[in-house]
């Protein structure tokens, strides 16, 4: 449902943010 889509988007965004932080460091 909608909630699982939101959770998936949040998970993907979290991974992207982590990768971005790793690139900065």
UniProtKB/Swiss-Prot annotation:
GO term, biological process aspect, one: defense response to bacterium
Statement: the UniProt record of this protein carries the keyword Secreted: yes
Annotated family: Belongs to the frog skin active peptide (FSAP) family. Dermaseptin subfamily.
UniProt xrefs under Pfam families: DD_K
Species annotation: Phyllomedusa tarsius (Brownbelly leaf frog)
Disulfide links within the chain: none
Protein name (database record): Dermaseptin-5
Subcellular compartments: Secreted
Entry-annotated residues carrying Valine amide: 25
GO cellular component, one term: extracellular region
Function description: Antimicrobial peptide, active against the Gram-positive bacterium S.aureus, the Gram-negative bacteria E.coli and P.aeruginosa, and the yeasts C.albicans and P.brasiliensis. Has hemolytic activity (15% hemolysis at 128 ug/ml).
């Amino acid at each position: 449902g909608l909630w699982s889509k939101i959770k998936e988007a949040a998970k993907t965004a979290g991974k992207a943010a982590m990768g971005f932080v790793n690139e900065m460091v």
